[in-house]
């Protein structure tokens, strides 16, 4: 019994059973798929299994076989001679696993040796914790390649090797990764650290050169522009060699396009020392010089693009523009990368790389980080892995106590939600940093998943250069004042190892300073980029009133209409979906007028026919929140989906429709990044309800409404925002139209409220066909999707155009009109139906379909027949303090006679967008319609 117990203990703690049963199962399944994918020792063991063992069999017989294999003392397996030896081997394997699990906690990660990065003592990493004594250090154990590819090893040697591997300048967190192949790769990569030397003398000198550049620029700026904000990189200087090593190594692995996003910390250093921005241009920005007509932005928000030479090829680099709102640029970068990958047909995600740079407080504190990570492995948003770097200077403005900044051990613990490995690395060790860079690139390229690099460093100055950090961090900054710079630490190391002399180190710094004095580029790898890859110049200075070709061939239209209504006979659609498609067939056959869903579908179909690409995403975008779109037909037999818009013809544009993750902020930011990268794709984001779009308010305020004015970034993104008062309460009624109008100026974006299917058709086509790329805010309907009056004829689509204003449609004699009511959106139909019910002939109703840019001439033309009228009303469903009234009243008044006072008909001012009771809603709706029509 004692013998069996020893074996049971051993099996419970090794890879051959017990607590590690999942390990053996996954390893065995890998072997069944490809015997060469497992180590030779495992392969021999699996080869010895009974031939009847098969993948579809229960795993219990396999585990039982291993238990029997161990007891029968087979040569291929780890064997135990006696209970004492077996018990010791258990402890050895537990000791090894302790380092793999928890070695990072004792790693030498903090350059200051000040905070929690170095836990004082982790008991499991001491051999004595596992019951060994000093006398056991010379004992040799048979570990059968379990670590370091060794058959046998002395305990003392093993302890030293594990400490050097897992407790040096790199701390790897990877045991939360569940995929066995990834885990084994990370483990093997980490345990190869002992195979020295890792870098040549030439590479090491280059690391110092890059540290010298990082240090030299900050010193130069500090002396030349004292007190000016630059958000210095000092203390985290290793970020520059880290970035350049990632670029170099990824290029050698096939990447030819790198898109980066980062906040303000170290951004100027990045611009000059990685992307190759001319120092003299940066100095001009410090001096306040500017030549652009745009309002511009501060220097540490600016983006940049360049080409970077690696060996005999070039890598295109892009640093995204971004605001001070931390972390929001990350999903923008991911969207830009996805757009490039799609354009290049990079289905393997091997040509374009995303790198996002975070701060330690922000990566743990900003919710958009979680939202972006959640998208990372989804079909519609994945880019095949992102390298995420945290510049961890252990302080957020004035807050440095981890107990205040987060509730986790590390700031990077958020990475574990997607099982991303985390490489913690000491910022004072550039060689460890370079190793982390290469490891991250190789992992991402091999497994197409995110990986984090936690660059643990410090901030030499305050949050900005005018800030005094000693006031709030006296202890930390007393250490920083005495601590040598990363450049000094590494230079001393190279000199002591005979790689360089003191004179060479000094000469290197002098040469860099001289280059700055001359204003020359300091990045030898910089190359002038090819600007012909994507032509944006054709979209500059376009007049939004200029005409465009809106007509479409009737024959071609009907052919496309037939195809968008077809799906395979073998596909069994849901009965309601089948009816919708049958109704659409009747529409193109002229038996029915077109509804909203058909008109929208035909907008996409006709654009695709002309070679335009279309990307539509949002929560429930495939079906449509209100069951109107059905761009994807789901087979009721097997759950597969069919997208008719992807089956028009061989030369059509690309159509994508994605049901998004349940997030507004990250998804809208992603689509903004996508749209700013590809002007030839009609990019659309649809809110589930317009009410929920304010979950992405940062994106709307900082990017969509102001990106062109601040940074010159054109964007043709469409936002579809379902809006309308139908008694559904304050959370399902309003897209907050007033907020978009309040953001409008300098023709920065368009705000449209289409009221007919033909209007949405032409609005979407116009957005793509005009040579203008500015955001379109489309206030889309809900109840109008099926309203019997909200229909259009085939002719209105084929031969019509977008109307910024729609005049009176009933046969009223203008001379009989005593009041003109102007309105937008769904309320028009409430007014029309009530007027018809009243048999009124003295009130004309004018629809303004585009609220911004306001179509002054078109409105005046629509009002011309009523020049004699002195009673004008603006009617809206929204409360007085919301909707278009306050923001557009001056525009409405400019279109009517000066002597006339414009009246208001609508809900009274309200703190809430809408009431929650249907009875009260109905009463209010009836009252505002009555106010508009009665006089």
Curated annotation (Swiss-Prot):
- Stretch forming the signal peptide: none
Cross-referenced CDD domains = TPP_E1_OGDC_like
Say if the entry is tagged with keyword Transferase. Answer: no
Q: Which UniProt keywords apply?
A: Glycolysis, Oxidoreductase, Thiamine pyrophosphate
Name one matching Pfam family: OxoGdeHyase_C
Q: Name one GO molecular function term.
A: oxoglutarate dehydrogenase (succinyl-transferring) activity
- GO biological process per UniProt: glycolytic process; tricarboxylic acid cycle
Protein's job:
E1 component of the 2-oxoglutarate dehydrogenase (OGDH) complex which catalyzes the decarboxylation of 2-oxoglutarate, the first step in the conversion of 2-oxoglutarate to succinyl-CoA and CO(2).
Name listed for the protein in its UniProt record: 2-oxoglutarate dehydrogenase E1 component
- Organism source for this protein? Haemophilus influenzae (strain ATCC 51907 / DSM 11121 / KW20 / Rd)
